[in-house]
Amino acid sequence: MTLHLTRQGATLRLRQGRLLLEEEGREVAGFPARQVRSVALWGNVRLSTPALVFLLRQGVPVFFYSLEGFLHGVAGAYPDPHPAHLRAQFAAEGLPLARAFVVGKLRSALALLERHRLPEAGGVVEALARAEGASELERLRGAEGEGSRVYFQGLARLLGPYGFGGRTRRPPRDPVNAALSYGYALLLGRVLVAVRLAGLHPEVGFLHAEGRRSPALALDLMEEFRVPVVDQVVLSAFRRGLLTPSHAEVREGGVYLNEEGRRRLIQLFEERLLEGVSHPLGFRKPLGETIEVQAQRLKAALLGRGRYTPFYLWR
């Protein structure tokens, strides 16, 4: 069970084996503590010290998000990266791994565009060929950027009626971009936990620039799952009327999901992670588990135990 707590001003407490959400001294929700697998606190939601200590001892990750969808960080009882894993990360040839992340992302983008018979698929094919043949990191990044730009042009054909004309961020400028940004924050939290559980250092990456407090490796691995998880959820939600422009609001110079919009997107995101998908290597698992599998396979590749194969939509 994943708890997403969005009730502003509420406090999560531990009492007699249950996690209780209280507001002004009044219990508004209760959960069996040992059935909780992760907790996400959104905005001004507090956590008592006994509850935090219990969650840490149980190895339950606690995500701290802003209401706008910025991931402040994750608390969890994770061991430090294994020295052998850390040495392997620093010693690895980065370009092949960076290429794998980009190729996975662009192949999923191509699959989605082809599924909807959008003409922008041709542009993604060209970007994919450039990425596969890139001999330098900057050229690879250029191919990824061009492929993403064309891909979002294709999505604009499907989502234009909802104000979407292309990807905008910091701040998002329309309801679709608001949902995408919020969904990517959710996804980053999941990938970050998977990387840590694999015993890897999340700040030592290969595609994204490294920087203090920047989870470069988690951002790298996340590229494979943007389209299959977040983009598909957002596209389906707007086209089915589960999300509408009424679920967003203008504030602080941008457009952000309102409380009901956040609640709906969180539910759809969690449901998507439970859906089974076929991996290019032939096995089938829920998407949430596939994220963890890819982190473990990345570790194996870094330790010289096999070649890394990215995940992507292929059928």
UniProtKB/Swiss-Prot annotation:
Its cofactor is Mg(2+); Mn(2+). CDD domains: Cas1_I-II-III. One of its GO terms (biological process) is defense response to virus. The keyword Metal-binding applies. One of its GO terms (molecular function) is metal ion binding. It is an enzyme of class 3 (hydrolase). Keywords: Antiviral defense, DNA-binding, Endonuclease, Hydrolase, Magnesium, Manganese, Metal-binding, Nuclease, Plasmid. The keyword Zinc does not apply. Homodimer, forms a heterotetramer with a Cas2 homodimer. PANTHER family: CRISPR-ASSOCIATED ENDONUCLEASE CAS1 1. CRISPR (clustered regularly interspaced short palindromic repeat), is an adaptive immune system that provides protection against mobile genetic elements (viruses, transposable elements and conjugative plasmids). CRISPR clusters contain spacers, sequences complementary to antecedent mobile elements, and target invading nucleic acids. CRISPR clusters are transcribed and processed into CRISPR RNA (crRNA). Acts as a dsDNA endonuclease. Involved in the integration of spacer DNA into the CRISPR cassette. Belongs to the CRISPR-associated endonuclease Cas1 family. This is CRISPR-associated endonuclease Cas1 1. The gene is cas1-1.
